[in-house]
Amino acid sequence: MEHTITRDELSSLLASARPPLLLEALPAKYFEDSHLPGARNMPHDAVAELAPALAPDRAAAIVVYCANAACQNSHIAAVRLKQLGYTDVRVYAGGKQDWIAAGLPVEQGSAVTA
C-alpha cells in the first residue's frame, strides 16, 4: 500500500531543503494544460519506460499525483515505482483538483520527460 500525503504535507516537502521529485501520472495533454510547479510528466502507463531517466536515484523522495482523489493513475504509478525498486514513494491523493481548489499556483507547458 502506498503512503498518501495531504496538500499541507506536500507544500511543506516542496518548501524543504530537499524537495521531492514531483511526478504527474496523467497523459501529456493534461500535464500541458496545467501541472503543479516543478512537476515532471510520467504517465502511469509509461512508468517502466520513463522512470530511469526521470528518477535515476531509486532512494530519492518521490511524490506522484494525478487529477483528483478519484483518479487512480497516481496509485498505479506508485505501485509500479515500488516494483521497480524505488523506496520513498508517496501519493498526493487530492491531486491537481485539490491543489487548484486551494488557490495554489500551477504551471502550463509541454511535458518534461527527461
Model-based region annotation:
Residues 1-21, 25-64, 68-114:
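Rhodanese-like catalytic fold shared by cysteine-dependent sulfurtransferases
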